[in-house]
């Protein structure tokens, strides 16, 4: 397929990082990545995420950081990706808030079990990072970060630097806005 060919082309060009999530295409993205890397596993680091779930035919998206859900999600992601260990496994969103510690504890168990190498989080604020850090070290934080979204610079980046937490920014081109492909008129129409 064109998607697999694109992944191969990226790997051939030296890209060595693929960041996906179970929720992207209801698992389809992980399956495509799995097919694309089946003969090239040593060439790439794989990151995927948990915490967004769907069930049944409706495919309505739910949120769960319950221990059982996180364990089930990693097993399904490993199967879809066709690998035995995920390089970076991240909690996608800190929701529901009251399940953050339970979910992070489950992720720590997955590190101990050898199903994931490193554990990270996405979209967590400072207070949430401080709540989970004592449970298990946070390897990385994936916040939105671009020239237009710089709020992480005030508290989050210094905290991460101090605690040796890597930053894996998402949306650095602000969903395409900073690519130069948006005219002044098009931007004005977005806010209208």
How does the language model describe each region?
Residues 94-192:
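Beta/alpha (TIM)-barrel catalytic core signal, keyed to glycine-rich beta->alpha loops juxtaposed to Asp/Glu
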Residues 78-96:
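Active-site groove signature of glycoside hydrolases
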Residues 1-45:
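N-terminal binding-site loop/beta-alpha segment at the start of enzyme catalytic domains
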Residues 12, 34-45, 78-82, 111, ...:
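Acidic (Asp/Glu)-rich catalytic clusters
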Residues 1-10, 64-81, 123-131:
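Short, acidic/polar
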Residues 7, 30, 34, 74-78, ...:
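Generic structural signal for well-ordered alpha-helices
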Residues 3, 10, 18, 33, ...:
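Conserved, mostly hydrophobic/aromatic
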């Amino acid at each position: 397929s064109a998607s697999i060919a694109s992944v191969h082309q990226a790997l051939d060009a030296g890209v060595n990082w693929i960041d996906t999530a179970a929720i992207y295409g209801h698992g389809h993205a992980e399956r495509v990545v799995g097919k694309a890397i089946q003969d090239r596993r040593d060439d790439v680091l794989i990151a995927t995420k948990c915490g967004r779930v769907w069930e049944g035919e409706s495919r309505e998206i739910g949120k769960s950081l319950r221990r059982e859900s996180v364990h089930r999600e990693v097993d399904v992601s490993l199967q879809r990706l066709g690998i035995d260990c995920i390089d970076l496994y991240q909690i996608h969103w800190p929701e529901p808030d009251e399940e953050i510690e339970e979910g992070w504890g489950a992720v720590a168990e997955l590190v101990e079990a050898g199903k994931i190498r490193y554990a990270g989080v996405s979209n967590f604020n400072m207070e949430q990072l401080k709540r989970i850090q004592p449970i298990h070290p946070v390897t990385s934080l994936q916040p939105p970060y671009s020239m237009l979204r710089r709020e992480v610079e005030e508290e989050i980046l210094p905290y991460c630097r101090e605690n040796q937490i890597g930053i894996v920014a998402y949306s650095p081109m602000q969903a395409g806005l900073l690519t130069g492909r948006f005219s002044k008129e098009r931007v004005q129409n977005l806010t209208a």
